[in-house]
């Protein structure tokens, strides 16, 4: 009899014990966001903003019982999140919060994107309810959790709408003119659109990259032919013809006190005489391209993360963070915290980098080299539509690596993010080594001077360490 009562007691305790949030929720969300950035042809800055706010919503939901204390005081102007009215389930709250943020930030996304995200959210809720069963408290817990998550999502969305992004939409920009200034002179042929069927516009969020790359894709193509323009006010596609996001540096940073809180080394002064700093840097680019090995070319393509072909570098590093957290066996809240810290670091890195880019409006290697050294010279990969200094890839990669090293240690890892794009997995001895390879890949591609890469790395390290010091994404 006593044994029977012990068994019954054990069963009752088990039925009341809260179900642990499944860490796979985090990786599922990150894959979805990567797919959205790709099919919507988002630029790196816009992708970083979308990912960062979604990551905030995911983390807030998974730490809902904390009443927002894990985020309070760590993000600029972050609102006080509503307190839960009773016990809530983290997964249900997270899905609800992310759903609200998605519906707000992605209101101008393609219909197929919006419907795919809605189906994903519905499937996650259905799976969670099945996991909870009668142990979860039934309909009341679900309703309470989803209501609380939606309330958090609305608070986060209101916070996002006050970051200055909307003020930059439609704002005219005329770049300064001068021999030392950037001009968007990449030939139109490298931006040739690809013809795709209507069926390929459907995003398969469980493996988005696999369905979006047509068989005839060229590694030089940047833009997929999709019915979406760069003039959207809330979710613009990348603008290849003009200056991409010239006012991005005016956005409110997430962790930095100001966009220029981390200093950057100024670019070399414009000069064409042999032996001058800029001429020497340009000759280094030419020599690197002339002796480019297949391995170096593969590295340039691996880290290109072009808009329209990938989730951009922001999605790439979020995927690295998610995969590494999963390999470590982190809990769902802890994994979401790692993704959040990484996404915030990348977002702030791009606000800082773009602020400096459009402050200095530095000439690109293609323009300088064709004018001064070789009029027929072309880089290995297309030149992006924004100024050179500092290098954006170097900045955001160094920022992400600094945060990941602070949170997880500067440890070896395997990156399989671009497997579906035709790139085999790469093994790295550390996050720092991966970031350094991402930076030098832009030299291999012929689109950055070494000075731009060096400045970007230093800037990114400063941003990443600032984010890490604020404890963003940490849990008690």
Regions found by a protein language model. Give the residues of each.
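Sec-dependent signal peptide recognition
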Residues: 2-8
């Amino acid at each position: 009899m006593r044994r029977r009562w012990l068994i019954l007691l054990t069963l009752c305790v088990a039925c009341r014990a809260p179900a642990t949030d499944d860490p796979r929720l985090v990786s599922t969300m990150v894959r979805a966001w990567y797919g959205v950035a790709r099919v919507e042809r988002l630029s790196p800055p816009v992708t970083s903003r979308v990912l960062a706010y979604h990551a905030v919503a995911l983390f807030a939901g998974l730490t809902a019982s904390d009443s927002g204390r894990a985020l309070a005081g760590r993000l600029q102007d972050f609102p006080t999140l509503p307190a839960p009215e009773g016990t809530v389930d983290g997964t249900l709250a997270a899905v609800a919060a992310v759903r609200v943020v998605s519906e707000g930030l992605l209101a101008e996304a393609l219909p197929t994107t919006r419907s795919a995200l809605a189906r994903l959210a519905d499937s996650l809720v259905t799976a969670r309810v099945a996991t909870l069963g009668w142990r979860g408290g039934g309909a009341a817990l679900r309703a309470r959790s989803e209501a609380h998550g939606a309330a958090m999502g609305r608070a986060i969305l209101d916070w996002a709408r006050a970051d200055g992004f909307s003020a930059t939409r439609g704002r005219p920009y005329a770049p300064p003119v001068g021999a030392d200034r950037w001009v968007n002179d990449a030939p139109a042929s490298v931006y040739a659109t690809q013809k795709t069927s209507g069926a390929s516009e459907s995003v398969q969020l469980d493996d988005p990259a696999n369905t979006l790359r047509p068989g005839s894709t060229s590694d030089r193509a940047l833009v997929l032919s999709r019915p979406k323009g760069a003039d959207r006010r809330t979710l613009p596609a990348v603008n290849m013809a003009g200056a991409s996001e010239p006012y991005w540096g005016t956005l409110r940073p997430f962790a930095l006190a100001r966009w220029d809180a981390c200093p950057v080394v100024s670019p070399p002064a414009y000069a064409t005489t042999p032996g001058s700093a800029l001429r020497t840097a340009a000759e280094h680019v030419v020599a690197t391209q002339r002796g480019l090995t297949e391995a170096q070319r593969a590295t340039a393509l691996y880290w290109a993360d072009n808009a329209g072909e990938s989730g951009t570098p922001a999605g790439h590093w979020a995927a690295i963070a998610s995969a590494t957290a999963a390999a470590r066996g982190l809990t769902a809240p802890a994994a979401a915290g790692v993704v959040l810290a990484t996404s915030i670091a990348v977002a702030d890195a791009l606000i800082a980098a773009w602020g400096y880019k459009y402050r200095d409006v530095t000439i690109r290697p293609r323009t300088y080299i064709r004018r001064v050294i070789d009029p027929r010279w072309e880089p290995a990969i297309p030149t992006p539509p924004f100024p050179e200094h500092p290098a954006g890839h170097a900045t955001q990669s160094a920022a992400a690596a600094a945060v990941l090293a602070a949170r997880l240690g500067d440890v070896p890892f395997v990156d399989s993010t671009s497997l579906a794009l035709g790139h085999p997995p790469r093994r790295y001895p550390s996050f720092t080594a991966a970031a350094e390879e991402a930076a030098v890949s832009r030299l291999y591609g012929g689109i950055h001077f070494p000075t731009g890469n060096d400045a970007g790395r230093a800037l990114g390290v400063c941003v990443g360490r600032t984010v890490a010091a604020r404890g963003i994404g940490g849990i008690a």
